[in-house]
């Protein structure tokens, strides 16, 4: 069985034919018979459904309360304007959400280039038409742009709180995917005497916010990560039980300085590496009395202060110190 697996062909040649800035054809060969459709269909579905991107998810237009309105001096109705906004190719650098503004009046065409952009926002298709204005027309709007993946209907983002404040805020169904079109064909390939092999040709087009080659690379990575779980699959594997750390009373994580002890007592404790209240309550009276310069008077003071907080000496903490308590913290305590 092992020898037959080793004899499986793996692709040795990949060719990228750049058709335009947004379109490319990727050829992969040779593949075993049937693997062209297997890989082609999987990559196509991932490219169309799982690529991250940005889209307009909400719009506020001056004088508009709902999407069935019409704006004086604007050729398009609100529904047409919203449809045009879905065609914007937007790229966010370092942010997941941003609000943009657009303001224009007078006769002319309103395009994506009229949108006021922040330094970390880029619109690829600046000539994309949003609306047409007459002489008395004016269009002022705020656009909320978010990062996402795949297709997300407006209802999926709207909470009860949003519904109470939704008048004038027009929600858009968002298609975040930067991939506009994907198709593939499987052709015949030949290696030496074998003529029944596959050659996969992917034809991919994006909106310009993502390079076609990078899109293929990301899709292949997603597919690889999903299949990796099967590589080390064991039939008798036991479910992994995560160990949960017991909760610790927050007061135990506070420094001993919060106890407001006398300077003498506080210095004696720190000399014994007792920085936190959790460190202190685990010491016994006998252990503390062995501390240099700490006498019975200081011991009584410590016991009284702890008692006022419902604590005492000689307590046991099984999970001390917690993992969240860094050693470096003690140096600054």
Swiss-Prot record:
Q: Name one GO cellular component term.
A: DNA-directed RNA polymerase complex
One Pfam family linked to the record = RNA_pol_L
Residue span of region Alpha C-terminal domain (alpha-CTD): 248-333
Family statement = Belongs to the RNA polymerase alpha chain family.
Q: Say which species the protein is native to.
A: Pseudomonas aeruginosa (strain ATCC 15692 / DSM 22644 / CIP 104116 / JCM 14847 / LMG 12228 / 1C / PRS 101 / PAO1)
Q: Taxonomic lineage of this organism?
A: Bacteria, Pseudomonadati, Pseudomonadota, Gammaproteobacteria, Pseudomonadales
Segments carrying the region annotation (Alpha N-terminal domain (alpha-NTD)) are 1-234
| GO MF assignments | DNA binding; DNA-directed RNA polymerase activity; protein dimerization activity
Instruction: Report what the protein is called.
Output: DNA-directed RNA polymerase subunit alpha
């Amino acid at each position: 069985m092992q020898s037959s697996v080793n004899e499986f062909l793996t692709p040795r040649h990949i060719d990228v034919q750049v058709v335009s800035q947004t379109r490319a054809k990727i050829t992969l060969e040779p593949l075993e018979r049937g693997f062209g459709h297997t890989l082609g269909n999987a990559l196509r579905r991932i490219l169309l459904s799982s690529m991250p991107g940005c889209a307009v998810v909400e719009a506020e237009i001056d004088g508009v309360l709902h999407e069935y309105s019409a704006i004086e001096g604007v050729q398009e109705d609100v529904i047409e304007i919203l449809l045009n906004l879905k065609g914007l190719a937007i790229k966010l650098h370092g942010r997941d959400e941003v609000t943009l503004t657009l303001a224009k009046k007078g006769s002319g065409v309103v395009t994506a280039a009229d949108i006021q952009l922040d330094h970390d926002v880029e619109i690829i298709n600046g000539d994309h038409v949003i609306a047409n204005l007459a002489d008395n027309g004016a269009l002022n709007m705020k656009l909320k742009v978010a990062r996402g993946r795949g297709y997300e209907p407006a209802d999926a983002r709207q909470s009860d709180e949003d519904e109470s404040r939704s008048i004038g805020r027009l929600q858009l169904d968002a298609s975040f995917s930067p991939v506009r079109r994907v198709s593939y064909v499987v052709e015949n390939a030949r290696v030496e005497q074998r003529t029944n092999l596959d050659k996969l040709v992917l034809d991919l087009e994006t909106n310009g916010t993502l390079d076609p080659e990078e899109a293929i690379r990301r899709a292949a990575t997603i597919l690889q990560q999903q299949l990796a779980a099967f590589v080390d699959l064991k039939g008798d594997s036991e479910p992994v039980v995560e160990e949960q750390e017991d909760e610790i009373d927050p007061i135990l994580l506070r420094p001993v300085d919060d106890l407001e002890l006398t300077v003498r007592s506080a210095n004696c404790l720190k000399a014994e590496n007792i920085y936190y209240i959790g460190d202190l309550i685990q010491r016994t009276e006998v252990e503390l009395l062995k501390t240099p310069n700490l006498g019975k008077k200081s011991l009584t003071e410590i016991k009284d202060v702890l008692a006022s907080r419902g604590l005492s000496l000689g307590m046991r903490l099984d999970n001390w110190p917690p993992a969240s308590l860094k050693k470096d913290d003690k140096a600054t305590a």
